[in-house]
From Swiss-Prot:
GO cellular component, one term: nucleus
Cellular localisation: Cytoplasm; Nucleus
Native source species: Neosartorya fischeri (strain ATCC 1020 / DSM 3700 / CBS 544.65 / FGSC A1164 / JCM 1740 / NRRL 181 / WB 181)
Subunit text: Interacts with lipid droplet proteins.
Protein's UniProt name: Inclusion body clearance protein iml2
Domain of life: Eukaryota
Function of the protein: Inclusion body (IB) resident protein that interacts strongly with lipid droplet (LD) proteins. Involved in LD-mediated IB clearing after protein folding stress, probably by enabling access to the IBs of an LD-stored soluble sterol derivative that acts as a chaperone in inclusion clearing.
Length: 719
């Protein structure tokens, strides 16, 4: 069988880095992608056959995917070890490639300096190691993660500069050729073309030499520290180290080139381009999403995200038919069907425009998902994404149906995700028994937040207890017993998992809630289930933003469930203080907002915000009420804008709005500007709020909302 190098060069190549890179990339292309088809054994077996840097990285990526899907400590340790091995191997191969760059038969990329593919392998390993480190329970590992992140950035920045320079030279060459061909004799045009080609080659060589210096030793502490102050993930180049050099923004024209473009004829260039766009895109996107308290820390050390550019780079990476393209597609679908659906204030969509990446480009997402389902037909991972997309577009019944089939994924982490998503969909649909059973199944499949799983299972049986309390005492007793059983189990497993050495937010929430109910039960001399306040399932639906996925009928069902608290069936309502009553109003306001009844929603929120905030502070109290009420008020104001269009197909449109504002265009703009101004005021208050329970979770919404407001202001400047 012919080797790839022989086919490319016409004769048997010498053993050099470039031909080895080509051979290794082709060898692992199919085995590596098997992980995205739920065939982990096939992926591991195929990757075990080689010892190259690319095979080492492939094994690390497989472990990384499993680690990020399941958050299990043993898998994360395995991923960390494999990625470290890949990073070390890549460093050795990079130096060898640079040393042997002038050997016969060596491939010389028109864009990248020798050894760039190995520098990218290091950056990928460093980035994935950083993510695993942040997910690790150790604070030390989390700190090390940021150091790896800095090193990866420097490498990726250098690679993108090569692409930028190549595109600039290509445009210059084209411009000179078109200019000379129109007014100069053919002999002179030929001479001019040669001169331009020679000049361009010399310039390109200088750029490659300069960037090769950066890539040669990206791990040196002195180099990292010197460049730290200049780090920026906003899509612009760092401050030039040479005073005479003027930094220019990274050119985006290369993102318009598809995989069949002439500049991607070599597999090494394909790997470098798709890989660097994926990695840098992930960096830009993740850092743009962090909560306000954490983003301040990142900005101090020079990290600033750019969501729009990050998404464009991920979309570009997803075009390529390799492992990186598949992972990029998974990241894109996860972002839009997960994060975007979790947030309530997002930038306005631009209908029919491919460049619209910050809204919810539904048609584009459907095409991407269809392509992935075709590439990986056996994978439950993409079926899971189809379910998420259905839920995001207010078709929860279809979303649940997709996850209730008999087929199971052989990959435990994917199966755990499937059951978890099924649990959430059942919760949104008020299918309590299915929800409880599914969350209990999660306990056996995943160890990430078992306290939350038990808590929600207990809450489901509490709802069933309340439903039959006055009509079937036997069933009521059974559900009360199960509810108390799972409630008592929840705090016993809380705190087992940590994120950056801190307890998981919902673990803290669950432990406090149980302690609060237990104290009330003793004080009121009632059972634990009768000491519970506002429906905890409705509270969970709110925290997981289930209302955005629900139809009007399903939202009305939530209102009916909330009405139980004030009904005669609730014998403890007269004992409730302002805290539980505020939670009831807040949850009702959230449902009314989703029903587009903003006047009623704001009235309820104003009543909460008019109270003394100290009423909601103290031991065992829900201190999240006021900051969340501020965010909810901001969301109502944002949705009241005349130009607001929800980012999903099941949304009500302008004709269904409670109020679309003034009809006159000038008055409408002024009305919208006023809505945005007030929205921003409430968001700023929420962002500056003191530490409170679940602040990191709510902070994600606040960060996304502030970015959306800033984008609106940039497109609607005041005269």
């Amino acid at each position: 069988m012919f080797r790839v190098g022989s086919w490319l060069y016409g004769k048997k190549p010498a053993a050099n880095a470039s031909t080895q890179s080509l051979d290794s990339l082709v060898e692992l292309r199919d085995p590596a992608t098997l992980i995205l088809n739920d065939d982990v054994d096939g992926a591991e077996a195929g990757l075990a056959e080689g010892t190259s840097t690319f095979h080492n990285l492939g094994r690390g990526v497989v472990a990384f995917i499993r680690a990020t899907l399941g958050f299990e400590q043993d898998i994360m340790r395995q991923a960390s070890e494999r990625l470290n091995e890949a990073e070390t191997s890549a460093s050795v191969d990079q130096h060898r490639a640079q040393h042997n760059s002038h050997a016969p038969n060596t491939y010389h990329s028109p864009m990248y300096s020798p050894g760039t593919e190995f520098a990218l392998c290091q950056a990928i390993a460093q980035l994935m190691s950083a993510i695993v480190g942040v997910l690790n329970e150790s604070l030390t590992e989390s700190i090390k993660a940021f150091y790896r992140l800095r090193k990866a950035y420097i490498t990726l920045d250098a690679i993108l500069k090569m692409e930028q320079k190549y595109m600039e030279e290509s445009r210059s060459a084209t411009l000179v050729e078109s200019t000379t061909s129109g007014s100069v004799p053919s002999s002179q045009r030929h001479s001019s073309s040669n001169l331009q080609s020679s000049s361009s080659s010399i310039s390109s060589a200088k750029v490659k030499e300069a960037t090769a210096d950066t890539l040669a030793a990206p791990s040196k502490d002195t180099d990292v520290n010197e460049r730290l102050a200049d780090l920026s993930l906003s899509g612009e180049a760092p401050v030039a180290e040479d005073p005479g050099q003027t930094p220019t923004p990274i050119n985006t024209d290369i993102l318009d080139h598809d995989p069949d473009s002439d500049i991607f004829q070599n597999q090494i260039d394909v790997f470098v381009h798709s890989g660097s766009n994926f990695c840098f895109g992930v960096l830009l996107l993740l850092i743009s999403m962090v909560p306000p308290s954490f983003s301040k820390l990142l900005s101090i050390i020079g990290f600033h995200g750019d969501k729009e550019r990050g998404l464009k780079m991920l979309w570009q990476a997803s075009k390529f038919h390799n492992l990186i393209g598949g992972i990029a597609a998974f990241a894109i679908l996860g972002y839009y069907n997960g994060f975007v659906r979790y947030c309530d204030i997002m930038p306005d969509s631009i209908p029919g425009k491919d460049g619209d990446v910050q809204g919810y480009p539904q048609k584009r997402l459907e095409l991407l998902l269809a392509k992935m389902r075709e590439r990986f037909p056996k994978s439950q991972l993409w079926l899971l994404e189809e379910s998420r997309m259905s839920g995001a577009n207010k078709n929860l019944d279809r979303a649940l149906e997709l996850l209730c089939g008999e087929e199971r994924s052989p990959l435990k982490q994917v199966e755990a995700l499937r059951v978890f998503e099924r649990s959430l969909n059942a919760m949104y649909l008020h299918k309590y028994e299915l929800c409880a059973d599914s969350f209990l199944e999660c306990v056996d499949l995943n160890s990430w937040s078992r306290s939350l799983y038990y808590y929600i299972a207990g809450s489901c049986h509490l709802s069933l207890y309340r439903d039959v309390k006055e009509t079937d005492s036997a069933k009521a007793a059974k559900h009360a017993e199960l509810a108390e059983k799972y409630f008592r189990m929840a705090p016993t497993v809380a705190g087992k998992k940590r994120f950056m050495a801190r307890q998981l937010p919902f673990d803290v929430f669950v432990a406090r809630k149980f302690a609060k109910w237990e104290a009330r039960a003793k004080e009121w001399k009632v059972s634990l289930v009768d000491a519970v306040g506002i429906d905890p399932i409705e509270e969970m639906i709110f925290f997981w933003n289930g209302h955005s996925r629900m139809t009007d009928e399903q939202l009305q069902e939530s209102l009916q469930k909330l009405a139980w608290s004030e009904s005669n069936a609730n014998t403890t309502w007269s004992r409730e203080g302002p805290e539980e009553k505020a939670i009831l109003k807040l949850l009702r306001a959230a449902v009314h907002r989703s029903l587009r009844k903003h006047t009623q929603a704001k009235e309820m929120l104003e009543d909460i915000l008019g109270q003394d905030r100290t009423l909601f502070k103290g031991h065992l109290k829900d201190d999240w009420i006021c900051p969340v009420a501020h965010f909810e008020m901001a969301a109502n104001l944002w949705m009241e804008r005349p130009t607001y269009i929800a980012n999903h197909s099941g949304a009500k449109q302008d004709s269904d709005k409670e109020s679309a504002g003034p009809a006159d265009a000038k008055d409408a703009l002024q009305y919208e500007r006023e809505r945005v101004r007030k929205c921003k005021e409430y968001l700023e208050k929420a962002a500056k709020w003191e530490s409170y329970e679940l602040d990191a979770r709510i902070g994600l919404k606040v960060t996304a909302a502030m970015e959306a407001v800033q984008k609106w202001e940039s497109t609607h400047p005041t005269v």
